[in-house]
């Protein structure tokens, strides 16, 4: 593997030569990590079966987990879909480029290696200049999951990628910290009624408003049933998990604080190091080894951005247990809670 400095290409100076090198690597069937507006992606030529296999190998991820295909224009979707659902154009006009992934029936151009063996394909147009330059410059559609090893929190800055992918990939395009920090909303358009398979920044209400029809929410988002074959990435395995055991405590604020402090004391008496995920409002009320505020409770965008970074920080501090407040906020709260519930393996204590 080359020195880290060769791999790193900072946004400020991702010059044409760097971009050309990245595009050449993609065309040659190699892997390049790149920023999107949601998280860093681990990209390869989506229509090249061997390239997609390299992604699974680098991530250590099971290959029945579909990859999202990143495109730069609506015609790219048309070129790989068996049929274009009527909703696709409406949603693309409203939300692309942006954090929305659509699932449609694939045609024969898309190898099963990219779709995790499914007859459907997940497609998104990212809203990030580096991502779009890479797609356009390589002339390839780029399959990319998040650029972390499987089960680790998703990377929101290039240093996270370097840490996880050390020596496994030839290039990281460093675009600085990313904006949203929570993955795209995934909507399945392959059936009669559109269905959200993964909540995200674009909400159910927003989709319904644009489509003027009902959009359902996959019951699996709330339940933890992992027996069905996953149609969307990350639906099957314990995901975004920190190394420590994470438990959510849910209820009225004063009761939550009291209960978490009680749990922290119990763990500390056993000689364990404990972390707490708090908000700006409650931060000073906890007595744990490491208390981190995820932001102001009203500021959903900050909570979303900080979530994965904070889960990684607890890994760095080697805490044994983490307790978190619950963030069932109105707008993207559903998406945030979905991530936290998965990270916690659905361990919730109501108070």
Predicted feature residues:
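Blade-terminus and WD-like Trp-Asp/Gly-His loop motifs, strongest in beta-propeller folds
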Residues: 1-2
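Active-site-adjacent structural elements in enzyme catalytic cores
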Residues: 5-351
